[in-house]
């Protein structure tokens, strides 16, 4: 059977009865209704069976919206922090909606006193063919303070990245990066233990060739004796069939569609990773970015991220 999964950063999903982060940041009733209407239309276009959401403040409202659209189960594992006096939410959460039964929720194991900035979801979902898959939803720590972080390209070696990472950590260039890496490491070791099909739906808050992806996916990040990459997770984009209709004579290959923009520059921050049981079963991959084509910054009544959808044979 085929299933479609997605990751969807909702961009401040907060009902007009509350503010988010500061008292003045609050939707009007009409803007809130417009945002919910846009999300519904987007979900109908995406036509997915399983969706991981980020930036969720108003959990009950999102659950109601998803159930209206035919999702059978909806879960969260954390409540956002609320300043009661002024009715201001101070933190966001992730959420998971599924048209298949969610059979079990487990906590992602952490070591010592470490905790995620936003608790991830780890859910066992039973499909129609009786196969059970494990779906993670995550939203890693952002660089909200715009601290210095090294940027890498597809030509950057792991050795180069780790060398610069050592400098960054030694000099405390970015506490956000340190937190994000610890989150990626924790997910890596939890997912590595899975003996069945597993999917990670995430806003990585880091770029396509970042050291964060190495920490999340690659055992060689941890074992320097390994001479070749040994991946625990695979970017579904890399395994999806490429479609070219009437290619131009000067066609120079595929360029990845950004999922977010910052000062006019496109970045891929939103990913769907799969483990070894699914990497060769990716049938389609699509980025829904029409709203960003109109306005790269997005808007509060839509989203500042594109939505990523992947079709998988299971």
Kindly label every feature range from the protein language model:
Residues 2-18, 130-157:
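Short, solvent-exposed beta-strand-terminating loops
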Residues 50-52, 56-145:
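Structured beta-strand-rich core segments of catalytic domains in phosphoester-bond hydrolases
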